[in-house]
Amino acid sequence: MRYLAIDYGDKHTGLAICDPAETIASPLTVIEGQKDLIKKIADIAKNENVEAIVIGLPLNMDDSQGFQAKLVFQFADRLKAHLQIPIHFQDERLSTFAAEEKLAAPEFTRKKKKKKRLDAIAAAEILEAFLEQKNAP
């Protein structure tokens, strides 16, 4: 199954996608701002033959849902109106930290390049966690 992961944010929304065998999660793109965000994601999902969506859910360290989690659920409701495919949620705690660790690699030396890719890499981290959980024995 082909999944599209979303690291939702007010200013930047990162997207990642997996291969049909569900073995590799790859950063796809970062969408800037909110203008036409839902339409852009719906178009990407259709063009990439996505069968389900995974949205990062920002939980607090005590597992409670804060204000940002409510915004993610509202975003998911808007997305459901445009896509007739399942939407899953995945705990995204520490996904940005893991993405920042990956960006410390030498190939990401320019600060602007790092910032541009961070949200897409965080989305890939979210998708990797989802796939590991889903495919665990």
Predicted regions and their residues:
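Phosphate- and other anionic-substrate recognition elements at nucleic-acid/protein interfaces
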Residues: 2-3, 10-11, 16-137
